[in-house]
Amino acid sequence: MCLSPVKGAKLILIFLFLGAVQSNALIVNLTDSKGTCLYAEWEMNFTITYETTNQTNKTITIAVPDKATHDGSSCGDDRNSAKIMIQFGFAVSWAVNFTKEASHYSIHDIVLSYNTSDSTVFPGAVAKGVHTVKNPENFKVPLDVIFKCNSVLTYNLTPVVQKYWGIHLQAFVQNGTVSKNEQVCEEDQTPTTVAPIIHTTAPSTTTTLTPTSTPTPTPTPTPTVGNYSIRNGNTTCLLATMGLQLNITEEKVPFIFNINPATTNFTGSCQPQSAQLRLNNSQIKYLDFIFAVKNEKRFYLKEVNVYMYLANGSAFNISNKNLSFWDAPLGSSYMCNKEQVLSVSRAFQINTFNLKVQPFNVTKGQYSTAQDCSADEDNFLVPIAVGAALGGVLILVLLAYFIGLKRHHTGYEQF
């Protein structure tokens, strides 16, 4: 089905019907004077739970219909975001935005809106009106690369479960031709494809190095500092700057891994009482930093979750929901330029370098005044110093008592 052109571009929107069961695969081809400027092919559906007039919850699944409009879709450029907007009649609309950076583009602000006033789609709905659900995920894709993901990506954003699969996507297409360079999603990769194997080469043989009982220690380089920011709509709600080094000590040979920001994607979300920063790359399925508000006055790092693949291809995962790091007043940021060690468990530590983080109350996309980690040390040293001083006084009192007692006893003997 070919739809009418958008101003400044042309959109071809095709629905494919596969097999006996309708599976509407969207193919979107936005064009400009040079040719294709945005290409997307994917499948999706949405499972929505809503309350009915008989005081029960009803769950429906909405797939892409065979009729849709595309008002508002655009190619974008260096200054303006690209976007795809799809309308499923009166009841449902869906949109995704793309922002171009120097070396990559971001996929963000995936928004689903559904109207429960449509009794055909939502029979017996109590809360009638338009409901909007925003997916907080933020993906980075290099320019001149097509992103592919055949696996089902599931996002549970209560009361909606969103599923996407069969994705072929490239925004800001260069020279009017879709790239042959591919970036495959992590879900399509197996541990054996992402686990690094170190080889040495000789003229006729290749030898895989294996750890020995007495490996020669080599210094681990300091990790590169990355900048991460999460947006809530058009407003930045979380900022983090840090170099990250992961240490796993349960292996026979400790596993140390530096996170490279250039090859790491990040997503997250912001809520009034909690905030999340999630990192992932080819070796890390996810690394979550979850922040919480304490006593309505301070924030702290409450939880860390990690799932990653080790050099031998095995998976490692750990979760700790009872942490208490990076404590600072709301409205400020937390900073620590020196190396810090976060003990998540006995087997897993995170070393941070040049850390600065603000998960709440970000103003104008900038960090607020920072509380330095040296203040934590001062707060820790003060009670130690006071305790030491009191201990010294107590020792002097006891010494004086025993000396006096001894003299008194000697006096009795002389008498």
UniProtKB/Swiss-Prot annotation:
Transmembrane domains' residue ranges: 380-404
Region (Second lumenal domain): 234-379
Chain residue ranges for the region called Important for binding and subsequent lysosomal degradation of target proteins: 406-409
Protein localization: Lysosome membrane; Endosome membrane; Cytoplasmic vesicle, Autophagosome membrane; Cell membrane
Keywords: Autophagy, Cell membrane, Cytoplasmic vesicle, Disulfide bond, Endosome, Glycoprotein, Lysosome, Membrane, Signal, Transmembrane, Transmembrane helix
Region (Disordered): 202-227
Side of membrane Cytoplasmic, spans: 405-415
Subunit field text: Monomer. Forms large homooligomers. Interacts (via its cytoplasmic region) with HSPA8; HSPA8 mediates recruitment of proteins with a KFERQ motif to the surface of the lysosome for chaperone-mediated autophagy. Interacts with HSP90 in the lysosome lumen; this enhances LAMP2 stability. Interacts with MLLT11. Interacts with ABCB9. Interacts with FURIN. Interacts with CT55; this interaction may be important for LAMP2 protein stability. Interacts with TMEM175; inhibiting the proton channel activity of TMEM175.
Family per similarity comment: Belongs to the LAMP family.
Entry function: Lysosomal membrane glycoprotein which plays an important role in lysosome biogenesis, lysosomal pH regulation and autophagy. Acts as an important regulator of lysosomal lumen pH regulation by acting as a direct inhibitor of the proton channel TMEM175, facilitating lysosomal acidification for optimal hydrolase activity. Plays an important role in chaperone-mediated autophagy, a process that mediates lysosomal degradation of proteins in response to various stresses and as part of the normal turnover of proteins with a long biological half-live.
Protein name: Lysosome-associated membrane glycoprotein 2
Organism: Mus musculus (Mouse)
Organism phylogeny: Eukaryota, Metazoa, Chordata, Craniata, Vertebrata
Name of the gene this protein is made from: Lamp2
